[in-house]
Structures are given as structure tokens and as C-alpha cells.
Amino acid sequence: MDGDCSSLLPAVCLVLADPKQTPPDDTSLEKLLDWFKDLHSQSNGQVLLEHQPCLLEFISSVCASKATDPAILSFTLKLTGLLAASKQDFHLLEEGGHLVCVFEREAWSVCDLWEDASVRSGWIQGLLNMLKHQQALDFICRQGLIKVILQLQNDRSLFVACLANQLLVQILKLLTPSDVTSGSDAVVSSKSSSSLDWVSVSSEITNAVVEALSSENHPQVLQGVQLLSLVLSQCEEPIRSSLWKDVLPPLEVLINRGSEPLTQPLMTVLRAAVMTPLLGQSEYKVEEFLEVMLGTGNRKEGILCATLIVKLEKCPKVLKRKAMDIILLPLQCVSTQSQDEKEVDLVLKEPLSQKALCISLLVQSLSSLAELAHKEYFEGVCIPSVTSRVVQLLRVCSGHCTSSLLHVSACTHLIGSCKIQRCGLDTLGALSVYEDNLDLRKDIFGVLLDYLKSPDSHATVLKKTFQAVLRWIGVCASFPDLLQFISNDLFPVLEKRMCDVRWEVRDSTLEFITQLTVALSDNSGFVEVLYTSGLVSILLSLLSDTEGYVRASAVTAVGEAVTSSVQQMALVSKINLLEEALAQMMIILSQDTEGFPRRAVVKTFTSWLKGSNPITALDSSLSSVLSLGGNDFDWEVKMHTLELAEALMEKMLTCCPYAVQSFSSSERTRLTQSLSKLKDLGLFDVLLNGLFDCDRPVCEKSCQLLLKLKRLNAEKADFDHDALVLKACGNRWGDEVQSRFLNKQQVKASEHVLIGGGEGTEKDLHCIKEIPLSVILQILDLDDMQRMLKLSSDHVVNSPRSLMEDILSAAQQSEENIVDCY
């Protein structure tokens, strides 16, 4: 604790303990607690209460007062527990009787303070904070606080009840294996009285869980189930198996009862159980419970349970197969022909006849299939059959429903259902990982093309369709008929979608074209098809779209089109594309009123610059891009401009890495030429302007790049520094640098006079019009600036000292207001 905080703390404690004072807001109290947590973690064995006795006085004062505000009492409870987390401070608090005083619930009940939920939650959090060692657990046992905690487990405040569960789990975690056996009946391994207390505690908690699970009161059952889940996931053996064995009878009753409101909580219990050694031991019935859950509750929960089972590593294959059948069942029902009626489960007939239930079941089935689309999860399943059913379902949703389908009534519910269409498309895309499906590619591309062509397709459905098409094109890239499909079928549809009246569709189409171009950039045939299709001219026209998002996506798409043509050495014949693209992008960067398109332009230039194939036509535009981007009012545009500057530095200074080293004569010449070119491009002005920008991320990035330059300009680099002279006047950074430069000159001049060197020359103190870059980098304390920039913006405002000063200031203002009233 620093000296300022140490001197302020006693006064703060007096203010907080004074019931006449209005307590600080909850946020301030929580920040104060966070500070104490930091002190505790950095204590290095020091006893905080010995150095700050005012804390003991504060705790005593709050305990003695009958008019304490609930917020202050809650704070005191948490603080006491936090202090008691240290063994030394725990002994001091216990010897002084403070622990009993603070955590004695009866005292707060008399004052009706216990009725406030914040006091009850503070009481639990205080115990949670303290429960870091066995002495704390021993204190809880001796004081009989377990009963209170178990009562709070059923508190009317859900927050308090959840905290009580967490506290009970923490208590069980502190019961070491030497204290409790793995059997149902605990056996004491030590004859100490404290061990006896701990064993009785574990039995008391176990009995409470059994009682809760056996209760007819739903909230009580729910809390018992939640505690069981926490114990299974957080506690070790033998506590875990001991508790499971005791709760097995009531848990079995609950699972067999099939209560729908409890299906999800019970699934959480089983999900935790399967992650433990309980799975695979028949006496614990975990697998048996999973099988029961497959057939109980609603079908949606059954599919969730089935998904969990399929993903289990240690699970009987028979159970996994049954689970997979349950997942596939809804899909199988709606896509089965009437002559195959025997194949389907007629239990689903009623749910499928109701629109809401039908859609819900299919969504869950499809989502599970998409999640499980990995080879090890689909063992023994005919993948092409599943894929065909998904294709059939997507056709039904788009209105192609044949009378031969078994559940024609269910099919009518699905026509135009965006939920089913989106889930079906996700599933179809996920199934692309299976080579067995490649023979179905014509059917798959056929249904996807139908969705792209359909005027009824929702914008979100089209986006999902594009994603699925991209995945299937990725796995079918080696097939010779793919380019024919793209040229004859896909591109004509894309042309129409690029002119769609809905801007979301135009945007999604452009994103798809960008991704497709990246995916097939190595395919010379695709690049040729792209340029002969007429899509490129539409891309260029969309650079002036009315919607900013679309313009931004068009910029990215054009950028990738140029990149792909350069990679295939096709730009020579398409030089007009680059010229027109550059012209329109410069207009966007200089005139567009929305930030997204301007950001996209700078990012595209950076992408071009980083490309493996140089685009010499960019050189004439780089200076303008740096100037416009560096002076943009959008901070993200400035950040992207700095990334462009970094790419330029990397590209032009590759022969001279950012490290202090000795250079040969030819290397020095190349370095000087490269730095001179960067200066001519205005890169140094961008970095220096960014250093004094109002947006901190921009300052940080500029500082980082200038530090690289500073290391490069170190004395050992030994090149002509005078060749890099920057104009200080007329630049935003000039005033700041000149001010620092002249201050240093004045200091030197005054020192010169003091040692008798004559009068300082007045001309040295005049406004400097030009300053060498090396001098600028020396003037600026970049290391210190970087350190300050890395601090959070609120490191001063939210410091402990500032917080305590605010508390004292508010208290003083309150007293002055009282005096004014008189």
C-alpha cells in the first residue's frame, strides 16, 4: 500500500462507519473491495491488519451499530471475509471476536437487516472470500453456519440461492480425501474433533440434497439438482461418488417421472456425470439414465440428450446408435415416401402435424446434425442417405412438395419457413466434409441454385445459401465440370443478385464473390471466366452504390479481383480495370461520407502492397492514400492507414531489419534511399501526426512504428541523417516538436551562460522550419510515451487514491450542506 492510500484509509473508514453519512454507491464500494483483493494478492506474507488497525476499528464499529446501512454492512461482510482469507489476519480477527460478531446472523435479524437481500448475499460472499484454508472451514463448522447456508439455498432471491450453492460446493471441495471415504457412510480417518465436524458437514449437505430431490416443491428440487451439477463438475473423489450414491434413489425417481420442466436441469446433471469416472460403472446407472432421458420429456430435449450421447467417447455403441436414430427421426419422417411408412416412428405423427412443434423438432434435429458433422460421430450412418434427406427437406421448404411424401400435412408447415431453410443450409454445408457425398454434387448444387434463383428467398436465407455453395465449391474444386457450373449457372444468378433491390442481398453477394475469388485465386480458368462474365463491370458500378456497406464490400471484391488477375499475370490485358478501380477508390477515400467504404479502400491498398506480386501502378497513389487516410476524421481509417504505413516500412526496409547493427556501404545507400522515398510519400508526417492524435489506439500504433524507426536510426546504423530533414512548419505535429526542441535549446543556452561561455545565440531559439528526423526521434521521449499510452484511460480516475478522495469529498460536501440548512 502506497503512502497516500495508507494516510487516507483511516479517514475513509470513519466515513463509512458513520451511519449519518450517505453511503457511497455500490460501484465505489466494489472498486474499494477490488483494491483490497489486489493488496491481499500482493501482500507477500505481510499482515494487513497489523499495518492498518483502522480496519479492525471499522469492523467493530459497524458490528456495534444498529443503524448501519445495508450497503455498508454488505461491504463489511465481504471485506471481513477477504481479510480472513489470510491465515495471519484470520487469527487476528478470530482472537478479537470479530469473526463471530460479523457472521452471527441473529444479530442482523434483530435489526431486520437480514431481510435485505444485499446483506444475505454479502454474508455468503464474505464466507466465500474467507474459505481459502481449513481454519475457515473449521470456523464455519463450529459456529453451526451450515444450517444457515442450507436455508439460503432456497432463498427467495435467486442470486442469494446461487451463491449459497457455490459456497456449499466450496465447503465440499475443502473436505480432503483423508477426511471422507468413498462410501455412502463416512468413516473418520482422524480422531480429531475437527475431522468429526467435517464428516458431519458432508453428511448434512448430502442429506439436504437428498431431501431437496425428494421434495414436491419444484424450486427446492431445482436448487438440489443445480447443487448436484456443481458438485459433479467441480469436486473431486471421493466426495463426488459418495454424493452420487446417496442421491441415486431420488434422482432415479425424477428421471423416470419425465417431468418436462426438469428435463434440461437433469440433462445438465448427466452432462456433468458423463465427464467423470462415474460413467462406465454400472452401479452408478449413468448410461441407464441417459437411455431413459432419450425417451422421456419432449422430443426436442430428447434430441439434445442424443447429441450429448453421440459425442461421448466412452459410451456403448448400441446407445450411440439409438441416439443417432433419435436425431435423424424428425428429418426421416418428413422426407419419407408413403410406401416406406414402416421405417418411421409414428409417435412423431402428432407433433409433426402441429406447425410450431414440427419446426422446433426439425430445427433441433438439423442443428444437431450440423454440430456432429465429423466422421467419428457418424459411424455406421449412411451419409449419402442423410444428405439426400436434407436436400429433400430444402426442396419441400421451397414449395416442391410431392404427394408421395408420408407426412404431407407436415410439409405444408415447412413451406417458406426461414428457420428450417437456414438450419438446413447450415447442415448441408457441414455435410460437405464427407467424400461419400461428392456423387450427389449435382443434386446439391441444384437445390442451392434454386434458392439463389428464387424471388421468395429471404436475405438471411440467401446468405446461408452462399455459405453452403462456397463450402461445396471448395470440396469440388478438382472436378472439371465445376467451372462450367460457375460460368453457366452461378454467375448469371450472381449478376441478378448484385442488382437486387435489397441492399443486404447485394452486400451478401459481394461478400460471396470476394470469398469465391480468394478460394479459387490459383485457378487460372476461374480468373478468365470471372473477367469474361461481365461481373467485373457490375463490381465497379457498385463502388458508387447508395448504401455504404455495399460500397465497402464492392471495394473489397474489386481488390480481390485485381489481386487474382495479378497472380495469374492477367493484369496486362486488364489494365483498364486497375486504372478505373484506383480512380474510383481515390474518390471514395476523399469524398465518401461514410467510414466503412473509406476503411475498405485503405485496407485494400494494404492488401495489394502485401501481395507477393508487385503492382507498380500503386506507386503514384500511395502518397495520396497516406495523406487522406492519415487526416481522416474516422479513427479506424487512421488505424488502417498506419497499417499501410507499416506494410510500406516492411516492404522498403527489408534489407535493413529493425535492429541496431553495422551496415556495409551499399546497405547504407539502400537504407538512405528507402527512407528518403518514405519521406517523399509523407509516411513520417502520418506517423508524427498520429503520435499526437486524440484517439489513443492511433497514438499507440504511431508510437510503436516510430520506435522501430528510432532503433533503425541508432548511431550504429551510421548513414546520412542530414538527408532526412522534415518540415516542421505547416504540419500538425510541428508545434509540439518545435516546442520540445526549443525547450531543449533554451536549457543548453542557459547552461552555456552559467559556465561563462558567453551569451546564447538568439537565432538558435527562433522558430525551426526544418528538423532532421534523427533529431525529432531524439527529442520525443517515445519509450515514456509508449508506457503512458499502454496504461488504461482511467488509471488515474479510478486509482485507489482517487476513489478514497472522492469518498471523503462527498462526505465533506454532505456536512457542508447540513450546515447550510441551519
Curated annotation (Swiss-Prot):
Q: Where are the HEAT repeats?
A: 490-528, 535-573
Where would one find the signal peptide in this protein? none
Q: Which GO terms describe its cellular component?
A: cytoplasm; nucleus
* Gene Ontology molecular function: ribonuclease inhibitor activity
Which residues are involved in binding Zn(2+)?
821
Q: What is its main location?
A: nucleus
Q: Where is this motif: BRAT1-like motif?
A: 820-822
Q: Which InterPro entries match?
A: ARM-like, ARM-type_fold, BRAT1
Localization (cell): Nucleus; Cytoplasm
Keywords on record: Cytoplasm, DNA damage, Metal-binding, Nucleus, Repeat, Zinc
Q: Does the keyword Zinc apply?
A: yes
User: What GO biological process term is on the record, naming one?
Assistant: cell population proliferation
Q: What does this protein do?
A: Component of a multiprotein complex required for the assembly of the RNA endonuclease module of the integrator complex. Associates with ints9 and ints11 in the cytoplasm and blocks the active site of ints11 to inhibit the endonuclease activity of ints11 before formation of the full integrator complex. Following dissociation of wdr73 of the complex, brat1 facilitates the nuclear import of the ints9-ints11 heterodimer. In the nucleus, ints4 is integrated to the ints9-ints11 heterodimer and brat1 is released from the mature RNA endonuclease module by inositol hexakisphosphate (InsP6).
Entry similarity comment: Belongs to the BRAT1 family.
What the entry says about domains is:
The BRAT1-like motif mediates inhibition of the endonuclease activity of INTS11 by forming hyrogen bond and hydrophobic interactions with the active site of INTS11: Cys-821 coordinates one of the two active site zinc ions of INTS11.
Q: Report the protein name in the record.
A: Integrator complex assembly factor BRAT1
Q: Which gene encodes it?
A: brat1
